[in-house]
Curated annotation (Swiss-Prot):
Keyword Endoplasmic reticulum appears in the UniProt entry: no
Class in the EC hierarchy, top level: hydrolase
GO BP annotations, alphabetical order: nucleoside phosphate metabolic process; ribose phosphate metabolic process
Pfam family, one: NUDIX
Superkingdom to which the source organism belongs: Bacteria
KW Ligase (keyword) present: no
Source organism (scientific name): Erythrobacter litoralis (strain HTCC2594)
Name the UniProt record assigns to this protein: RNA pyrophosphohydrolase
Molecular function per GO: bis(5'-adenosyl)-pentaphosphatase activity; guanosine-3',5'-bis(diphosphate) 3'-diphosphatase activity
Domain Nudix hydrolase positions: 12-158
Motif Nudix box positions after renumbering to this chain: 47-68
Length: 164
């Protein structure tokens, strides 16, 4: 599907929720996407909000699906007071989410991880979305994400930095 800028402008943003999971050492969880391994795309747990779900419920569901970390091991300590958006680059328009969205509007939560590394299982979801994971310094996150999501990650880090 070819998308002109007018078509792109008419599309909505997909509603999404994400979790910045911080450990006791002040590092945050990042995982490499299986479908973007050649791009080196790392990200935090995130995904679409299902009908009837609150933003926080969606964020915690995505956390468990993508990392195996249940809500009882992740204490939500903050919520970003405003959503952040990104637009898909032209080469991805029409390829993701059935071509129905121009990008995502993301609602972010900061959660303190109270478990151990053994509680993390990125193969918990079938099929898994991630090939590997690591703890990183918060300021390293924007460099790890695909370029079109960098401003979102900068905003999330800025918002939660003092609480990590």
């Amino acid at each position: 599907m070819a998308s002109g800028s007018a078509d792109h402008e008419d599309l909505r943003y997909r509603q999404c929720a994400g979790v910045m999971l911080a450990n006791r050492e002040g590092l945050v969880f990042a995982a490499q996407r299986i479908d973007s391994k050649n791009l080196g795309a790392w990200q935090m747990p995130q995904g679409g909000i299902d009908p009837g779900e609150t933003q926080q419920e969606a964020a915690m569901r995505e956390l468990e699906e993508e990392t195996g970390v249940s809500a009882d091991l992740a204490d939500v300590i903050a919520r970003m007071p405003y959503p952040v958006r990104y637009d898909l680059p032209e080469e991805l328009q029409g390829k993701l989410w059935g071509g129905r969205y121009r990008g995502q509007e993301q609602h972010w939560f900061l959660a303190r991880f109270t478990g151990t590394d053994a509680d993390i299982d990125i193969a918990a979801h079938n099929p898994p979305e991630f090939s590997e994971w690591k703890w990183v310094e918060p300021d390293e996150l924007p460099r790890l994400i695909v370029p079109f999501k960098r401003e979102v990650y900068r905003a999330v880090v800025k918002e939660f930095r003092s609480l990590i």
